[in-house]
Amino acid sequence: MQGKAKVTSFDKKPGFATLRAQFPPGSVAGIAVGASVAVNGTCLTVTQQHGDELCFDLIVETLRATNLGTLGVNSCVNFERSARFGDEVGGHNVSGHVHTTAAISDIEVTPSNRKVVFKVPQALMKYILPKARASCVAPRPWFAP
Protein backbone atom coordinates (compact mmCIF):
# COMPACT_ATOMS: atom_id res chain seq x y z
CA MET A 1 0.00 0.00 0.00
CA GLN A 2 1.34 3.41 -0.93
CA GLY A 3 -1.32 5.54 0.67
CA LYS A 4 -4.95 6.38 1.24
CA ALA A 5 -7.37 8.18 -1.05
CA LYS A 6 -10.81 9.59 -0.25
CA VAL A 7 -13.91 8.76 -2.31
CA THR A 8 -15.39 12.00 -3.66
CA SER A 9 -18.27 10.44 -5.59
CA PHE A 10 -19.70 7.00 -6.20
CA ASP A 11 -22.25 6.83 -9.00
CA LYS A 12 -23.91 3.42 -8.80
CA LYS A 13 -26.15 2.11 -11.56
CA PRO A 14 -27.51 -1.41 -12.13
CA GLY A 15 -24.45 -3.63 -12.71
CA PHE A 16 -22.05 -0.71 -13.05
CA ALA A 17 -20.53 2.11 -11.01
CA THR A 18 -18.10 4.98 -11.38
CA LEU A 19 -15.74 5.65 -8.50
CA ARG A 20 -14.03 9.03 -8.18
CA ALA A 21 -11.34 9.49 -5.53
CA GLN A 22 -9.03 12.28 -4.36
CA PHE A 23 -5.43 11.14 -3.94
CA PRO A 24 -2.74 12.80 -1.80
CA PRO A 25 -0.99 15.72 -3.54
CA GLY A 26 1.55 14.49 -6.10
CA SER A 27 0.86 10.79 -5.50
CA VAL A 28 -0.59 10.25 -8.99
CA ALA A 29 1.77 12.56 -10.88
CA GLY A 30 2.54 11.21 -14.34
CA ILE A 31 -0.38 8.79 -14.36
CA ALA A 32 -2.50 8.65 -17.52
CA VAL A 33 -5.92 7.45 -18.58
CA GLY A 34 -5.60 3.69 -19.10
CA ALA A 35 -3.08 3.22 -16.29
CA SER A 36 -3.63 0.60 -13.61
CA VAL A 37 -4.04 1.47 -9.93
CA ALA A 38 -4.81 -1.03 -7.17
CA VAL A 39 -7.66 0.29 -5.00
CA ASN A 40 -8.34 -1.78 -1.88
CA GLY A 41 -6.26 -4.48 -3.56
CA THR A 42 -8.38 -4.46 -6.72
CA CYS A 43 -6.72 -3.64 -10.04
CA LEU A 44 -8.66 -0.76 -11.64
CA THR A 45 -8.13 1.21 -14.85
CA VAL A 46 -8.04 5.01 -14.76
CA THR A 47 -10.86 6.35 -16.96
CA GLN A 48 -10.49 10.07 -16.17
CA GLN A 49 -7.96 12.26 -14.39
CA HIS A 50 -8.47 15.73 -12.95
CA GLY A 51 -5.27 16.69 -11.10
CA ASP A 52 -5.00 14.42 -8.06
CA GLU A 53 -8.53 13.08 -8.58
CA LEU A 54 -8.96 9.85 -10.55
CA CYS A 55 -12.04 8.04 -11.89
CA PHE A 56 -12.53 4.31 -12.34
CA ASP A 57 -15.39 2.33 -13.89
CA LEU A 58 -16.44 -0.75 -11.91
CA ILE A 59 -18.14 -3.56 -13.79
CA VAL A 60 -20.62 -5.99 -12.29
CA GLU A 61 -17.94 -8.62 -11.53
CA THR A 62 -15.82 -6.07 -9.65
CA LEU A 63 -18.87 -5.00 -7.64
CA ARG A 64 -19.72 -8.63 -6.88
CA ALA A 65 -16.28 -9.89 -5.92
CA THR A 66 -14.87 -6.94 -3.96
CA ASN A 67 -15.88 -4.53 -1.23
CA LEU A 68 -15.79 -1.58 -3.64
CA GLY A 69 -19.57 -1.64 -4.13
CA THR A 70 -20.04 -0.79 -0.45
CA LEU A 71 -18.09 2.46 -0.65
CA GLY A 72 -19.68 5.86 -0.28
CA VAL A 73 -18.60 9.49 -0.41
CA ASN A 74 -15.81 10.17 2.14
CA SER A 75 -14.87 6.47 2.40
CA CYS A 76 -11.10 5.99 2.58
CA VAL A 77 -9.45 3.44 0.31
CA ASN A 78 -5.95 1.99 0.16
CA PHE A 79 -4.11 2.51 -3.11
CA GLU A 80 -0.98 1.37 -4.84
CA ARG A 81 0.32 2.39 -8.23
CA SER A 82 1.75 -0.19 -10.60
CA ALA A 83 5.36 -1.18 -9.98
CA ARG A 84 7.97 0.28 -12.32
CA PHE A 85 11.43 -0.98 -13.18
CA GLY A 86 13.85 0.32 -10.59
CA ASP A 87 11.24 0.53 -7.80
CA GLU A 88 12.09 -1.10 -4.49
CA VAL A 89 10.18 -4.33 -3.98
CA GLY A 90 9.90 -4.69 -0.23
CA GLY A 91 7.79 -6.83 2.05
CA HIS A 92 5.81 -9.74 0.71
CA ASN A 93 4.25 -9.57 -2.71
CA VAL A 94 0.65 -10.57 -3.22
CA SER A 95 -0.25 -11.15 -6.84
CA GLY A 96 -3.50 -12.02 -8.52
CA HIS A 97 -7.03 -10.75 -8.82
CA VAL A 98 -9.78 -10.37 -6.25
CA HIS A 99 -12.33 -13.16 -6.56
CA THR A 100 -14.36 -12.77 -3.39
CA THR A 101 -14.53 -11.23 0.03
CA ALA A 102 -14.44 -13.11 3.31
CA ALA A 103 -15.75 -12.42 6.78
CA ILE A 104 -13.84 -13.08 9.98
CA SER A 105 -15.61 -16.00 11.63
CA ASP A 106 -13.34 -16.44 14.65
CA ILE A 107 -10.26 -15.05 16.34
CA GLU A 108 -8.39 -17.47 18.57
CA VAL A 109 -6.14 -15.71 21.09
CA THR A 110 -3.23 -17.42 22.84
CA PRO A 111 -0.61 -15.84 25.10
CA SER A 112 1.81 -15.40 22.19
CA ASN A 113 -0.30 -15.41 19.04
CA ARG A 114 -3.59 -14.85 17.29
CA LYS A 115 -5.23 -17.04 14.70
CA VAL A 116 -7.78 -15.33 12.48
CA VAL A 117 -10.29 -17.63 10.79
CA PHE A 118 -12.02 -16.42 7.63
CA LYS A 119 -15.29 -17.74 6.22
CA VAL A 120 -14.84 -18.32 2.49
CA PRO A 121 -17.46 -19.63 0.04
CA GLN A 122 -17.12 -23.44 -0.18
CA ALA A 123 -16.76 -23.36 -3.98
CA LEU A 124 -13.54 -21.34 -3.60
CA MET A 125 -11.92 -23.44 -0.87
CA LYS A 126 -10.05 -25.56 -3.42
CA TYR A 127 -8.07 -22.41 -4.32
CA ILE A 128 -7.09 -21.60 -0.73
CA LEU A 129 -3.58 -22.86 -0.02
CA PRO A 130 -2.05 -23.50 3.40
CA LYS A 131 0.32 -20.68 4.39
CA ALA A 132 -0.56 -18.68 1.27
CA ARG A 133 -1.00 -14.93 1.40
CA ALA A 134 -4.20 -12.97 1.27
CA SER A 135 -4.84 -9.25 1.24
CA CYS A 136 -6.98 -7.74 3.97
CA VAL A 137 -8.75 -4.42 4.10
CA ALA A 138 -9.87 -3.60 7.61
CA PRO A 139 -11.15 -0.48 9.36
CA ARG A 140 -8.83 1.11 11.90
CA PRO A 141 -7.60 0.00 14.28
CA TRP A 142 -6.23 -2.73 12.03
CA PHE A 143 -4.84 -4.73 14.89
CA ALA A 144 -5.73 -4.65 18.55
CA PRO A 145 -3.92 -6.12 21.56
Task: Report residues per predicted region.
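Conserved loop->alpha-helix
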Residues: M1-P145
